[in-house]
């Protein structure tokens, strides 16, 4: 068996020891080496040729962001998983790491002593992410017969809402898609990105600086407005409900689905109920299959589904399940998704004007 080789970069002796302990228990993973700071790690890359790097954000001499910036000059495709804290500073730094090319991140709990629950929390995050990133996770679901073959180049029902779901690689994908939506975009956009509390707020703030239409983390019982983007809050599901002649956004802490809260499936089911055939759903890069069942529900309601292609996905898990099941009417590179959203919404707006 060819084991996946991991280079651990962390200034903490305790964390380095814990990661060694975690990886030693996985038959398909091995520690290629350890480094206490970025300078040492960069010197070790040629010698060790790791398959993936775990990189702490806060380190002396050369921190994780500086290390990542240098690493990406020579190794643009090497998977890098950042280690961050559940703090405002950690959230901001993690989003900056994504802009520099980080593949994913793991949050360090306050309790990470040997034998503590923190160790299992790190294991539960880290091991699946290493496997997904290094094996370019392919969905196990076999292709299913195409049941939804409606040609929506000229859709019969105008698009009245856009719902987007993403996970691993999502922040960068969203930064490539959402800024394409122009000022005056006529429908609301709802986004689920798998992230913990605080991280989602800073993600929304970053996207708001990049986009032509306002972006904000969703608030409880918020009235849906066209031409706005709302991001689900970490540790809360986001749903859309009818309210008289309009719609309302809700936050809830119902049970996780697909081990996720917020979950894409929860959002997709709610928009299918609220908007029916007027939904345009987009499933982008991410591990696992969150969004698959919700995409089925949207297609059964007459809505439209687009999936990101494998070549531009960091992990082709979520969009791959949707594409392989024949649920996606189009499978597109991330660079084309924003324009496709605008095209389909514009067709519907033109239909309404001509009605």
Curated annotation (Swiss-Prot):
The active site is at 167, 194, 290. GO terms for cellular component: cytoplasm. Keywords: Chemotaxis, Cytoplasm, Hydrolase, Phosphoprotein. SMART domains: REC. GO terms for molecular function: phosphorelay response regulator activity; protein-glutamate methylesterase activity; protein-glutamine glutaminase activity. Gene3D superfamilies: 3.40.50.2300, Methylesterase CheB, C-terminal domain. The modification 4-aspartylphosphate is found at residue 56. Residues 155-348 form the CheB-type methylesterase domain. One of its GO terms (biological process) is chemotaxis. Pfam families: CheB_methylest, Response_reg. Signal peptide: none annotated. Its EC number is 3.1.1.61, 3.5.1.44. It catalyses: [protein]-L-glutamate 5-O-methyl ester + H2O = L-glutamyl-[protein] + methanol + H(+); L-glutaminyl-[protein] + H2O = L-glutamyl-[protein] + NH4(+). It is found in: Cytoplasm. Phosphorylated by CheA. Phosphorylation of the N-terminal regulatory domain activates the methylesterase activity. PROSITE patterns: CHEB (PS50122), RESPONSE_REGULATORY (PS50110). InterPro entries: CheB-like, CheB_C, CheY-like_superfamily, Sig_transdc_resp-reg_Me-estase, Sig_transdc_resp-reg_receiver. Residues 5-123 form the Response regulatory domain. Contains a C-terminal catalytic domain, and an N-terminal region which modulates catalytic activity. Belongs to the CheB family. Involved in chemotaxis. Part of a chemotaxis signal transduction system that modulates chemotaxis in response to various stimuli. Catalyzes the demethylation of specific methylglutamate residues introduced into the chemoreceptors (methyl-accepting chemotaxis proteins or MCP) by CheR. Also mediates the irreversible deamidation of specific glutamine residues to glutamic acid. This is Protein-glutamate methylesterase/protein-glutamine glutaminase 1. The gene is cheB1.
């Amino acid at each position: 068996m060819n084991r996946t080789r991991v280079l651990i970069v962390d200034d903490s002796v305790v964390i380095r020891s814990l990661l060694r302990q975690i990886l030693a228990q996985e038959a398909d993973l091995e520690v290629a080496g350890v480094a206490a700071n970025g300078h040492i790690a960069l010197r070790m890359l040629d010698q060790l040729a790791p398959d993936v790097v775990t990189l702490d954000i806060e380190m002396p001499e050369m921190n994780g962001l500086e290390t990542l910036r240098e690493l990406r000059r020579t190794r643009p495709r090497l998977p890098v998983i950042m280690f961050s804290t559940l703090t405002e500073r950690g959230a901001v730094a993690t989003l900056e790491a994504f802009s520099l090319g980080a593949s994913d991140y793991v949050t360090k709990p306050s309790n990470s002593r040997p034998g503590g629950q923190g160790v299992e929390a790190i294991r539960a995050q880290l091991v699946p992410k290493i496997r997904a990133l290094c094996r370019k996770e392919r969905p196990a679901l076999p292709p299913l017969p195409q049941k939804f073959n409606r040609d929506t180049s000229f859709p019969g029902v105008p698009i009245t809402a856009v719902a987007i779901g993403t996970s691993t690689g999502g922040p960068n994908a969203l930064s490539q898609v959402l800024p394409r939506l122009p000022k005056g975009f006529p429908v609301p956009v709802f986004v689920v990105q798998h992230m913990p509390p605080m991280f989602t707020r800073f993600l929304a703030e970053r996207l708001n600086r990049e986009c032509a239409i306002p972006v904000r983390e969703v608030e409880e019982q918020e009235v849906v407005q066209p031409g706005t983007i709302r991001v689900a809050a970490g540790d809360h599901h986001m749903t859309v409900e009818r309210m008289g002649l309009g719609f309302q956004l809700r936050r809830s802490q119902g049970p996780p689905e697909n081990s996720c809260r917020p979950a894409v499936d929860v959002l997709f089911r709610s928009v299918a109920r609220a908007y029916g055939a007027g939904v345009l759903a987009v499933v982008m890069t991410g591990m696992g299959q969150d969004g698959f069942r919700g995409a089925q529900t949207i297609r059964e309601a007459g809505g439209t589904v687009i999936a990101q292609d494998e070549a531009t996905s960091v992990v082709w898990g979520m969009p791959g399940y949707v594409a392989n099941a024949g649920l996606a009417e189009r499978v597109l590179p991330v660079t084309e998704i924003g324009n496709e959203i605008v095209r389909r919404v514009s067709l519907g707006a033109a239909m309404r004007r001509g009605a």
